[in-house]
């Protein structure tokens, strides 16, 4: 089962790796910087469409954010 804490950790890592500031990310996906801060703190979860946009902006596979890995 995926937890908010797992998604939060993956999101924090993706933001660090991207080198983008919260304000830049917020502008690109059409939310406030405070909203990005809430996602990072785990106070709020992004909607599915916002999460998809975050993945595009952060250049990360949604499966990584959602901690979904195929083991074949």
Predicted region positions:
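Residue-level detection of the helix-turn-helix DNA-binding "recognition helix"
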Residues: 16, 30, 41-43, 52, ...
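Residue-level signal for the short linker/turn that defines the boundary of a DNA-recognition helix
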Residues: 20, 46-49
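Short, charged recognition helix plus adjacent turn
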Residues: 1-2, 19, 38, 66-72
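A short, Lys/Arg-rich alpha-helix, primarily the initiator
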Residues: 1-20
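Short alpha-helical DNA-recognition segment
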Residues: 19-38
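DNA major-groove recognition helix of helix-turn-helix/homeodomain DNA-binding modules
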Residues: 49-64
């Amino acid at each position: 089962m995926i937890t908010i804490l797992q998604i939060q950790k993956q999101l924090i890592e993706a933001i660090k790796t991207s080198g983008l500031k919260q304000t830049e990310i917020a502008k690109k996906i059409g939310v406030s910087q405070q909203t990005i801060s809430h996602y990072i703190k785990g106070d709020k979860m992004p909607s599915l469409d916002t999460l998809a946009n975050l993945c595009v902006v952060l250049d990360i596979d949604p499966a990584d954010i959602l901690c979904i890995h195929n083991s074949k």
